Amino acid sequence: MNLLARIFGRKPSNPDDWLEPAELAALLKSKTPPVIVDVRGPGEFSGPVGHIASARNIPLNQFPNHIAKLVAEPRDLVLVCHSDLRSAAAAKLLRRAGRTKVAVLRGGMMGWRT
């Protein structure tokens, strides 16, 4: 386990839980694109790095208030943050609540922008 994972208490996830930026780009062009949830704060979401056009902004500190609605969402969910640490934490919360179709954008917005 790497240093950041130990610091944040996050164990490596199943490789199927991660979505590469190119895979997300293709899914966004499909007939049934996933719901993108950006867990960064409003300042980051609207800041210079920007956000994915269709993303919903639900900051991680407000995430618990939205779990029931997100668990019930019929489409697949993709979570994103600046790198991928906060989105991985949010995915863990959703999985604990029973949500199975949830992925984390590998590298977050930094991966998306490269």
Regions found by a protein language model. Give the residues of each.
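Short, structured coil segments at secondary-structure junctions
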Residues: 51-53, 98
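Conserved beta-strand scaffold positions in the cores of enzyme catalytic domains, especially
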Residues: 18, 36, 55-57, 102-104
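Glycine-rich nucleotide phosphate-binding loop and flanking beta-alpha elements
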Residues: 43, 64, 85
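Short active-site oxyanion
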Residues: 32-36, 53-54, 76-77
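Flexible, polar/low-complexity N-terminal or interdomain linker segments that lie immediately upstream
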Residues: 1-49
